Amino acid sequence: MINTRKTHPLMKIVNNAFIDLPAPSNISSWWNFGSLLGICLILQILTGLFLAMHYTSDTMTAFSSVTHICRDVNYGWIIRYMHANGASMFFICLFMHVGRGLYYGSYTFLETWNIGVILLFTVMATAFVGYVLPWGQMSFWGATVITNLLSAIPYIGTNLVEWIWGGFSVDKATLTRFFAFHFILPFIIAALAMVHLLFLHETGSNNPTGIPSDADKIPFHPYYTIKDILGILLLVLFLMLLVLFAPDLLGDPDNYTPGNPLNTPPHIKPEWYFLFAYAILRSIPNKLGGVLALISSILILILMPLLHTSKQRSMMFRPFSQCLFWILVADLLTLTWIGGQPVEYPFIIIGQLASILYFFIILVLMPITSTIENNLLKW
């Protein structure tokens, strides 16, 4: 009997990616985040589609249309909060996924890693333009402040900002184009995710030991399909707890006030998942320097394969590197906290120290520690 799963042109692709895929037998729950990100993306596209059916991208009616969705549309409130909190879940999974890659040395798959960094930038761009759409105070001023950073680019900066705004300030043209970007970008993310997966399946998955696992592979289905389903159930549980019990926990109260160009909020800050980068941006007194530091804080991930000096791929058997890794995590949490605080003593100095430490750990301490560990292997 001919097995359609293995012969049908379309089914064959699905089969080779999700069913008969040879997977390492020892990958832990840290390898669940790829599938969780896929689920997050599907969820965001679906909830976003239903929101777009009722949303109007006009400065006069945008805020009212979001209120209308929450009050008058059948189950509009749950769709809106699933979309808003779904973004938070997306970023939690994203940070865990990147952290896993750093810890276990997955960045040695160069193409997969670089596409992943591009994906990270694209998701961040999507989240930023999406945050502007409800046209609340924080939406409006967040858009004004962040787009204004481009004016730090020498010579073309001011023209570039006005070109993005579609005028001399954030206004109707800006909102309309941001809605267009927010609609198209998730589909670009989906396409990039497929390329990401394509490159991953060229090499096969990494595993916690960092040692090639060709000698010990198991089929993806049923072993990892059932494991992924457990992860998805936990993700949905956590998301729905957030949506149904504390929908505004991660949001900003200022966004329940319609955007007003004549009234600036006392503390302008982005959503929690951008706070670490925002803290790095604010810790440098110079505008251009801050923008460069902001971009570098993410772009530094591309350098990870070059900074890898260890003879071992994974950090599993490298206790000193493990300590540094967790100090880096603590540093990022500190930056996230600082990003949400007002610009005053002692937060300014803490932010500056945390920013310096962030780059110092990645660029200096990690390569040196790896070299020391290499020498310890000879003892």
Curated annotation (Swiss-Prot):
Cell compartment(s), UniProt: Mitochondrion inner membrane
Lineage summary: Eukaryota, Metazoa, Chordata, Craniata, Vertebrata
Any GO molecular function: metal ion binding
Cofactor comment text: Binds 2 heme b groups non-covalently.
Role this protein plays: Component of the ubiquinol-cytochrome c reductase complex (complex III or cytochrome b-c1 complex) that is part of the mitochondrial respiratory chain. The b-c1 complex mediates electron transfer from ubiquinol to cytochrome c. Contributes to the generation of a proton gradient across the mitochondrial membrane that is then used for ATP synthesis.
The entry's keywords: Electron transport, Heme, Iron, Membrane, Metal-binding, Mitochondrion, Mitochondrion inner membrane, Respiratory chain, Transmembrane, Transmembrane helix, Transport, Ubiquinone
Organism the protein comes from: Cervus elaphus nelsoni
Protein's name in the database: Cytochrome b
Oligomeric and partner information: The cytochrome bc1 complex contains 11 subunits: 3 respiratory subunits (MT-CYB, CYC1 and UQCRFS1), 2 core proteins (UQCRC1 and UQCRC2) and 6 low-molecular weight proteins (UQCRH/QCR6, UQCRB/QCR7, UQCRQ/QCR8, UQCR10/QCR9, UQCR11/QCR10 and a cleavage product of UQCRFS1). This cytochrome bc1 complex then forms a dimer.
Family to which this protein belongs: Belongs to the cytochrome b family.
